[in-house]
């Protein structure tokens, strides 16, 4: 896993819905157990009621692991976008504009591609675009990840896709992300297939 995330110092997890709490905690735990110093930072609106929930599981402003959405995006080498579909449709131009060149955009659903195709726009060419879609609800992704610490093979399977590889490392990042969130098996798909299902 350290090789898959080589050069990624910060992963920004944007949102705190069903998938975000599970994926953020699983990533943080996986990075720690692999001896990696990659930081997982949650990006939320400052007035979001979800800030209290993120703080309750150890993501805080004091530790630099909780911040404002666009500040987190601009500082992250990988941005995992786990906000609602409506928020993605509204905010994607600002989100993409805020990302660093060479960063990786991670999605857990293909919805954004459909929105962008409908709008007649494409992803920036200087970023990676990958998908990891766990095949279960967020709470089960976390519960089975924790169970997997003592029961070999426990976890939620996931699909993964590489939609755009700007750096030559997008495949490694996608597979590493799937492993880090606890998928015992990951199967290849496309971003388009994930939103047309």
Feature annotation, model-predicted:
Residues 24-25, 89, 93, 171-175:
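Predominant activation on well-ordered alpha-helical scaffold segments within soluble catalytic domains
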Residues 31, 87, 96-99, 174-185:
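Structural signal for hydrophobic packing residues in well-ordered secondary-structure cores
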Residues 106-197:
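Rossmann-fold dinucleotide-binding core
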Residues 45-46, 55-114, 122-137, 146:
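Rossmann-like NAD(P)-binding element
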Residues 1-62:
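NAD(P)+-binding Rossmann beta1-loop-alpha1 motif at the extreme N-terminus of oxidoreductases
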Residues 16, 47, 84-85, 163:
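Short beta->alpha junction loops/turns
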């Amino acid at each position: 896993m350290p090789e898959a995330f080589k050069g990624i110092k910060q992963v920004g997890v944007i949102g705190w819905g069903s998938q975000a709490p599970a994926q953020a905690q699983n990533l943080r735990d996986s990075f720690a157990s692999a001896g990696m110093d990659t930081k997982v930072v949650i990006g939320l609106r400052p007035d979001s009621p979800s800030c209290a929930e993120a703080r309750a599981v150890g993501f805080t402003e004091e530790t630099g692991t909780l911040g404002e959405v666009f500040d987190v995006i601009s500082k992250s080498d990988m941005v995992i976008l786990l906000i609602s579909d409506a928020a993605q449709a509204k905010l994607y131009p600002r989100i993409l504009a805020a990302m660093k060149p060479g960063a990786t955009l991670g999605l857990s659903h293909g919805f954004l591609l459909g929105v962008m195709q409908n709008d007649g726009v494409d992803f920036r060419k200087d970023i990676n675009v990958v998908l990891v879609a766990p095949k279960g609800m967020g709470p089960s992704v976390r519960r089975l990840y924790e169970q997997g610490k003592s029961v070999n093979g426990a976890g939620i399977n996931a699909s993964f896709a590489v939609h755009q590889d700007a750096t030559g490392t997008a495949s490694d990042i996608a597979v590493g992300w799937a492993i880090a969130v606890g998928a015992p098996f990951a199967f290849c798909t496309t971003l388009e297939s994930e939103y047309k299902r």
